[in-house]
């Protein structure tokens, strides 16, 4: 595969020497082993690997190279989840915030700024979602920044409640496997607590 044109980004904004786009992962599986502190990219797997003790698989659909999960709720309100390993913190859109704040389901904590890989700064409200349920997975006290991120417009999700699932959520698990070809999001729950995963606040 040859690339004729590629964007040139400032490494100070990326925090790395480069970024691997989702377009290169269409037949791959990305595995984050948070206990072993490793990340690996391997071919999509068969169902046998899903038998690891403590694992839960959530089916997803693909849209513009990303995995979306619709079997999800935030504080009891329906929400579309977008897997986003490039986001350090979970990001919610304005439609989701309106759903939650209309019934006092969450309270704003403080104003924050996010820095994108292109150097763009986004202002947002930093809050906690008390409970996020994705398939058979429940996350408690999830730190979220609500802002008008470009990804929501790109995926036609700017007018319906949606959440970019960032790395602060994924680090709650022992392992996370994102299988783009088979459209599956698999997590391995930590042994200490498989029912009540408490989220550490993002910084």
Model-derived features with residue positions:
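Pepsin/retropepsin-fold aspartyl endopeptidases
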Residues: 1-203
């Amino acid at each position: 595969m040859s690339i004729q044109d590629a964007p040139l980004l400032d490494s100070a904004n990326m925090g790395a020497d480069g970024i691997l786009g989702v377009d290169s992962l269409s037949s791959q599986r990305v595995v984050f082993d948070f206990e072993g502190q490793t990340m690996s990219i391997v071919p999509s797997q068969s169902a046998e690997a899903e038998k690891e003790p403590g694992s839960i698989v959530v089916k997803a659909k693909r849209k513009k190279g990303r995995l979306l999960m619709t079997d999800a709720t935030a504080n009891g309100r329906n929400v579309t989840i977008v897997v986003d390993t490039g986001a350090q913190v979970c990001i919610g859109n304005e439609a989701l915030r309106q759903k939650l704040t209309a019934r006092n389901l969450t309270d704003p904590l403080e104003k924050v700024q996010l820095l994108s890989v292109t150097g763009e700064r986004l202002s947002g409200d930093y809050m906690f979602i008390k409970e996020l349920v994705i398939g058979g997975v429940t996350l408690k006290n999830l730190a979220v920044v609500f802002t008008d991120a470009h990804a929501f417009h790109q995926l036609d999700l700017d007018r319906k409640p949606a959440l970019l699932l960032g790395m602060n959520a994924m680090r709650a698990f022992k392992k996370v496997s994102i299988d783009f070809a088979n459209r599956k999001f698999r997590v391995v729950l930590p042994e200490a607590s498989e029912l009540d995963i408490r989220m550490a606040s993002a910084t």
